[in-house]
Structures are given as C-alpha cells and as structure tokens.
Amino acid sequence: MGEKPGTRVFKKSSPNCKLTVYLGKRDFVDHLDKVDPVDGVVLVDPDYLKDRKVFVTLTCAFRYGREDLDVLGLSFRKDLFIATYQAFPPMPNPPRPPTRLQDRLLKKLGQHAHPFFFTIPQNLPCSVTLQPGPEDTGKACGVDFEIRAFCAKSIEEKSHKRNSVRLIIRKVQFAPETPGPQPSAETTRHFLMSDRRSLHLEASLDKELYYHGEPLNVNVHVTNNSAKTVKKIRVSVRQYADICLFSTAQYKCPVAQLEQDDQVSPSSTFCKVYTITPLLSDNREKRGLALDGQLKHEDTNLASSTIVKEGANKEVLGILVSYRVKVKLVVSRGGDVSVELPFVLMHPKPHDHITLPRPQSAPRETDVPVDTNLIEFDTNYATDDDIVFEDFARLRLKGMKDDDCDDQFC
C-alpha cells in the first residue's frame, strides 16, 4: 500500500528554538467578497515562557523607499494595517472557535500549543514586490504581510530576533472564472497632403485572460490607403504599476518586445498574427518591475493583474498592476500609428486550494500520549495522522545567496 497523502503544514522556529509557528499555507486568496482567514498555532517552551505572554501580530506594510535611506528617524514605510492577537494566556472570550486544522494541530502538539486567528480586511492590497536594481541593498520596495510571534510581558515590550518568529505571507488573487470580452482596438490616421487618404490599424487578442507563461496571439490588420509606407511593425507588452499612497503615480515597464520588418506598401492591406510571451526570466535586470514575490525564489513571476472590487477605496490599495499590448506601425515620414490592448495576466486557481477531506475513520477511544520533545517533533504517532510538516522557507533559485534570518521569506 502506498502512503496516503497528508495535509501540508508550514513551520518556522525562532533562532533560540523556544517558539515555533505553524501555518496551513503561505498564500492567502482574496476572493473579492472575502479573504482567506489566517489561522495558525504557536508552540512555546513552557520553561522559557515563565510569567510572560505570547503575542502574534499581523502587519501589512508598504515600503516605498530603500531601507538604507532610513535615516534621522525618517522611514520610507507606511503601515497599512496592524492587528494583535494574544495567544497565551488565552482571552476570556476568543473571537471564534479553533478551525479544523487548528484542532488537529492542538491535539498533535499538546497543551503548550496555542491558536491564533486574523481576518484580513478586503480593502488591503495584494502582495507586490518592486524588483531592486543590481546595486540596491536592504529590503525591496513593495507591499508585504508579516506575521510575528514573540514572548513579552506586554505588547509594548521590545522583542528580540532570538526569541521571535517572523513570517512573510502573501495575499494573492487568482484568475476569475468568467473572463471579460476579447480585447480589440482600431484607429485611423489621416496624413497631411495625402488627399484625405488614410492608414487604418486594427488589432485584437484571442482572449482577455492569460496565465503566466502563456503566449499572447496578437492579430494585426492594416489597411493602407495612404501614400505612406509602413516600414516596421512593433508589438510590445507593457506592465503598468499605479502607486497609490500619498498621491497616485504610474510607472510603465516593457516586459516583452517584438519588432518585424513587415512592410505595408501604399494602397495595400496586411494581416498577420504575432506571438509574444512576457516572462520574468527576460526582465531580471529591470529596476522597479512589479513581481508577485521575491526575485530569489523559484515561485516568483511577474506581478499578477490587480482585480479591484467595485467601489473600493484606491487610496489604500498600495500598488495596482495592469498590462497592455501595444501595436505600433512605424511609418516613413509621417509619424507612428499605434493602439493599445488591455489584458489580464494571472494564475489559475489551483485544484488543491481546498484542503482534501480527512479519510473517514472511527475515532480512537484511547488518549494518545504526547511526546515531551515538542520543539523537535520527533513524535511516535506520525503514522496515525495525515499532517506533514514542512519548513516555511520557499525554494531558492540556484546560485542565489542565502540571507539567513533577514530573508523575508524564511
């Protein structure tokens, strides 16, 4: 018989191994009408805890300047949301009962494990990182969500790295089930001294929604009734990042470009389908490019398009990402003619996003002894449960330097 699949649970311990945090996932989905709740468990060494309390915080922050520029008490960082949860001693009236995963973890880890729970507001931005330049140091700019667990006598007490756990989670969106209409655009250019004759450009995409890594098919149709000659046709994909903080500024960055020496003579027509694929691997040196995660990690890609709920307050949205295909005709002695086609670039909703149901089995009548060596979790009953523990750190690209505890995703 093969091994039955287990429920994956991510864990990370403090440097002194006295505190361990467990989460069922690292990415939390924004469904527009609701956001996945953050439910986890923190395990504490009781001998180390003594008379202190256990706090867990969730912070959404927007860093809009390099960390090495934080001088004279000025920080290029704005906290968009902060929530605190006292995991131990438990509050008299907890906000909600433990979830199913928390119940299973509490039974497995024993009496020194304590649940925590956060609700992410719907108006908070999704996680976006702006790609740093080759010479940039410190934390990258962008929006991130951090969970921090620590022991202290009060929430105001300063915590130390050695006895605290920091985890960067991501708030993500997946592609909608019903995509929008097929993008298309057209324009007509009249030239001076051309006897009212015109150059007509029409372009369209085969669909509106594309997944990361999927090629885009751009259909270009040119009707040249003018006396001008189209010398070249350029097709490019541009990423637009609207930075919404104190004021709104827009940055654009080409992520894929294609240039063909396709000429369209006067009084002729032309039709062709161009294929172009925007990939992060072709843009790893571009400073300020919006990404879904850290550049050093394997699951990183170009930032997904941001889907904004109708009526949302854009002032607290952080970074809004969108994409457009630009088709440009290079015309001899007459200026260029171009159109833009907006499209959506996202990940499909994974099939394993919903946790598989636990196999039906009769409940055990006898109590299972809990091992005292909880920090290492060398348990004797692993074969009786379907929980699989995995380190929280994400897989790195080969050759990337390890930043140890300062790494945002470790």
Swiss-Prot record:
GO terms for biological process: adult walking behavior; cell chemotaxis; G protein-coupled receptor internalization; modulation of chemical synaptic transmission; negative regulation of canonical NF-kappaB signal transduction; negative regulation of interleukin-1 beta production; negative regulation of interleukin-12 production; negative regulation of interleukin-6 production. Functions in regulating agonist-mediated G-protein coupled receptor (GPCR) signaling by mediating both receptor desensitization and resensitization processes. During homologous desensitization, beta-arrestins bind to the GPRK-phosphorylated receptor and sterically preclude its coupling to the cognate G-protein; the binding appears to require additional receptor determinants exposed only in the active receptor conformation. InterPro entries: Arrestin, Arrestin-like_C, Arrestin-like_N, Arrestin_C-like, Arrestin_CS, Arrestin_N, Ig_E-set. The modification Phosphoserine is found at S361. Belongs to the arrestin family. It is found in: Cytoplasm; Nucleus; Cell membrane; Membrane, Clathrin-coated pit. One of its GO terms (cellular component) is endocytic vesicle. It holds the Pfam family Arrestin_N. Residues 364-410 are annotated as: Interaction with AP2B1. It comes from Mus musculus (Mouse). The lineage of its organism: Eukaryota, Metazoa, Chordata, Craniata, Vertebrata. Keywords: Cell membrane, Coated pit, Cytoplasm, Cytoplasmic vesicle, Hydroxylation, Membrane, Nucleus, Phosphoprotein, Protein transport, Signal transduction inhibitor, Transport, Ubl conjugation. Changing L395A: Nuclear localization. Causes nuclear relocalization of MAPK10. The modification Phosphothreonine is found at T383. Phosphorylated at Thr-383 in the cytoplasm; probably dephosphorylated at the plasma membrane. The phosphorylation does not regulate internalization and recycling of ADRB2, interaction with clathrin or AP2B1. The ubiquitination status appears to regulate the formation and trafficking of beta-arrestin-GPCR complexes and signaling. Ubiquitination appears to occur GPCR-specific. Ubiquitinated by MDM2; the ubiquitination is required for rapid internalization of ADRB2. Deubiquitinated by USP33; the deubiquitination leads to a dissociation of the beta-arrestin-GPCR complex. Stimulation of a class A GPCR, such as ADRB2, induces transient ubiquitination and subsequently promotes association with USP33. Stimulation of a class B GPCR promotes a sustained ubiquitination. This is Beta-arrestin-2. GO terms for molecular function: angiotensin receptor binding; D1 dopamine receptor binding; molecular adaptor activity; protein kinase B binding; ubiquitin protein ligase binding. The modification Phosphotyrosine is found at Y48.
